[in-house]
Structures are given as C-alpha cells and as structure tokens.
C-alpha cells in the first residue's frame, strides 16, 4: 500500500510559515513598535501633551520636543505607549480658556540656562469609533 506525502507536507509547510511570522503578529494584544511619524501616533502624542498640561500643577505650559519611541497594542481600540521629551515654555497658564496643542507648540522656550526638559512615558487608549481618547498612564522625570 502506497501512502501519499501530501497530507503530511501541507500542515508541515503551514507550521513553518507560522514560525517565520514576527512574534507580535502571532500574539493577540501583543505590543508592536510604531513609527514616530505615523499619523495615529502623532494624534496620540498631541493628546498626551494636552492632557499633561491640563493635569500638571506647573504654572507654565510644556511643549513637545520629540517622540523618542512609540509602540501600540490592539485592545478594544488601540493603546499607544509613548516616550516623549517635553520642554517648559515661557507661556504661563492663566485663568480662562486653556491653550490647545498648536498654541502650546508655538510658545517660546526660555533661555538655554533656564530650560527644563522632561522625559515622559504616556499610555493613550484610543477608541476612534467612539471619538474618544484617554490618558491611562503618565510618568515624567
């Protein structure tokens, strides 16, 4: 009796193909690197800066210098893990309407000797179908 090699070869090829996939694509909810220039990352970063300034008790606004690293995770929506550098500006927080991101980015920086730079780690949860973003974690030093 002759046995065909076809039934064994097909599953073996499938297994080999799966092993060659990047690990993040194999694990549902795995964290993957993202480009810092990705529009969704940029939007999450803008939101993080806006929220940082709203929650901070500092008398001056901080603006985004750069996104150092970005990662994302597919959850019920997307969670963005951002490492960013922020710099204290000369724009004082005053009573009334708070500044929006684009206004903050236009704020002048103090002279070099007086500059305060922070490295911050943010987690932003985005649910676009609800038009909602939430800052779930924030730490700066």
UniProtKB/Swiss-Prot annotation:
GO molecular function: cysteine-type endopeptidase inhibitor activity
Domain Cystatin residues, every copy: 29-129
Extent of the signal sequence: 1-26
Keyword Secreted annotated: yes
SS bond partners: 91-107, 120-140
Matches recorded under InterPro entries: Cystatin_dom, Cystatin_sf, Prot_inh_cystat_CS
Tissue and organ expression note: Expressed by the venom gland at an extremely low level (at protein level).
Residues carrying the site annotation Reactive site: 29
Record localization: Secreted
Secondary area of contact (motif): residue ranges: 73-77
Pfam family, one: Cystatin
Keywords: Disulfide bond, Protease inhibitor, Secreted, Signal, Thiol protease inhibitor
GO CC, one annotated term: extracellular exosome
Role description: Inhibits various C1 cysteine proteases including cathepsin L, papain and cathepsin B. This protein has no toxic activity and its function in the venom is unknown. It may play a role as a housekeeping or regulatory protein.
Family in the record: Belongs to the cystatin family.
Other remarks in the entry: Negative results: the recombinant protein does not inhibit calpain-1 (CAPN1), a C2 family cysteine protease and legumain (LGMN), a C13 family cysteine protease. Does not provoke cell death (PC3 prostate cancer cells).
Protein name, as recorded: Cystatin
């Amino acid at each position: 009796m002759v046995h065909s090699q076809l039934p064994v070869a097909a599953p073996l090829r499938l297994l080999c193909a799966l092993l060659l996939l990047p690990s993040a694509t194999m694990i549902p909810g795995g964290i993957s690197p993202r480009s810092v220039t990705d529009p969704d990352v940029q939007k999450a970063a803008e939101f993080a800066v806006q929220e940082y300034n709203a929650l901070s008790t500092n008398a001056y606004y901080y603006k985004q210098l750069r996104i150092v690293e970005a990662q994302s995770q597919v959850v019920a929506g997307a969670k963005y893990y951002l490492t960013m550098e922020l710099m204290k500006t000369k724009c004082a927080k005053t009573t009334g309407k708070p500044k929006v991101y684009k206004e903050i980015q236009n704020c002048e920086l103090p002279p070099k000797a007086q500059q305060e730079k922070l490295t911050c780690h943010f987690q932003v949860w985005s649910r676009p179908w609800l038009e909602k973003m939430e800052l779930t974690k924030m730490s700066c030093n």
